[in-house]
Every structure is written in C-alpha cells, then in structure tokens.
Amino acid sequence: MKKELFLLRGLPGSGKSTLAETLGGYHLEADMFFTNDDGEYNFDPQQLPTAHKWCKTMVEELMGEGVERIVVSNTSTQLWEMEPYLTMAEENGYTVFSLIVENRHGGNNIHGVPSESIERMKNRFEVQL
C-alpha cells in the first residue's frame, strides 16, 4: 500500500483548496475548523493556533488509520509550519509531496483576507529546494 501526504502551500486565493479536491484523498485544512455544520465560515483569529492543532491532530489520526492519501492545504508560509507534518509522515511511512500553489489565475481569496495581510505572508514566504 502506497501512503502519500500532499502538503499544499500558498497565499490565500491561490487555489490550494481547489487543487486539494482535484487530488482526491482525504483533504484537511485549518480553515475547516472555522466552518460550521451549515457550511458557514466564521473566522476567529484568536482560534488560529487551535485550528492548526486540530488539523495536525486529524492528520495524525488519519495516518494512524493508514489512510492512503492525505492532502493538507494551508498557507504554510514558513518552513517550520510543515515540520510537524513531515515528522508524522516519516514516523508513519508516508511519502511527502510539497507543492507551492501560485495565484497565476488571478483568483480572489474567499475568506476576505486583507491585502496587507497577504502582502506580509508573501514577504515571509520561505522556499527550500
């Protein structure tokens, strides 16, 4: 059985979630923490650390169950943000694919992230080749 973890990174509006759905498998992202059962998105910046902890916990549970393909789509502008996922993947025998999704289609972020915040994310975005 081939086990894969896809880590999709990029700025808000780049198409991470759309690509994640295209890849198939089990899709998770911190934004899901803020979406209620009726599909309404209610972002609370004070809950962002909790949302990311929830996402990591869910990935850990899925890996423990041996789910073959897990796709995580978060901004992950800094490399340290991927480290917990890389560690879990190694411990559970997952091959990791890290993809940076660029906003080449002019997509808008659906969560109303202010342009100043996106600019800060862009300025701190780290890449390791």
Regions found by a protein language model. Give the residues of each.
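Walker A (P-loop) ATP-phosphate-binding motif of ABC ATPase nucleotide-binding domains
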Residues: 5
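Hydrophobic anchor at the beta1->P-loop junction of P-loop NTPases
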Residues: 8
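Conserved glycine(s) of the Walker
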Residues: 15
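Short beta-strand-centered segment that lines the nucleotide-binding/catalytic pocket of NTP-utilizing
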Residues: 26-38
